[in-house]
Amino acid sequence: MSVNFELQAEPRADQGKGASRRLRRAGKVPAILYGEGKDPQPITLDHNAVMLNLEHEAFYSHILSVKLGGKAEKAILRDVQRHPCKPIILHLDLLRVSEDHAIRVHVPLHFTNEESCVGVKTGGGMVSHQMVEVEVECLPKHLPEFIEVDVASLNVGDSLHLSQISLPEGVSIVALSHGPDHDLPVVSILKPRGAAAEEEAGGEAAEGGEAS
């Protein structure tokens, strides 16, 4: 189900570390809204609202509506700075987007049919994720909240690569634009631990026989 995210923002005049600390003590998060040929706009956001939004996976790969001065601007989350020890958001970077300009965003991967996968159900294999997200390029209207990766047909020893992912309309994977060497595995079905150990032991025994 699609979720709409709205951020109520206020313009921020004071900048610098001291001003940012004062904002955080007041329950605010300093942020910057930039891009699309416009001047960067320092803003503040409500810390509790930001924390709640960050709990949603879709918030990281979604077109956000930033309400500022009675107007709404579309943006994507570009960066989050967190306190290393405390549950505090230090700063957000928000990138403006327009309907006719392509954007690049990291989108989470959702793996389906893992339990019914051939290699798991009949071969006793284990699913191994090499990636949990992928960078895509698309127009804002085509941006998916996540991409499904179906592993049902994978057998033991099989891997599914980037080029084998079924993509929504208008969406491409950035890595594949750099050539076939970047068509990396996304998920693999590993051999059962016992079988892998037996193969290794068998290989060592064969080497020992040849040496003698």
From Swiss-Prot:
Keywords recorded for this protein, A-Z: Ribonucleoprotein, Ribosomal protein, RNA-binding, rRNA-binding
Residue numbers spanned by region Disordered: 1-22
UniProt keyword Ribosomal protein, yes or no: yes
Superkingdom of the organism of origin: Bacteria
GO biological process: translation
Gene Ontology molecular function terms on file: 5S rRNA binding; structural constituent of ribosome
Gene3D superfamilies in the record: Ribosomal protein L25, beta domain, Ribosomal Protein L25, Chain P
An example Gene Ontology CC term for this record: cytosolic large ribosomal subunit
The keyword rRNA-binding is assigned to this record: yes
Homology family: Belongs to the bacterial ribosomal protein bL25 family. CTC subfamily.
HAMAP family in alphabetical order: Ribosomal_bL25, Ribosomal_bL25_CTC
Function: This is one of the proteins that binds to the 5S RNA in the ribosome where it forms part of the central protuberance.
Assembly behavior: Part of the 50S ribosomal subunit; part of the 5S rRNA/L5/L18/L25 subcomplex. Contacts the 5S rRNA. Binds to the 5S rRNA independently of L5 and L18.
Descriptive protein name: Large ribosomal subunit protein bL25
Record organism: Thioalkalivibrio sulfidiphilus (strain HL-EbGR7)
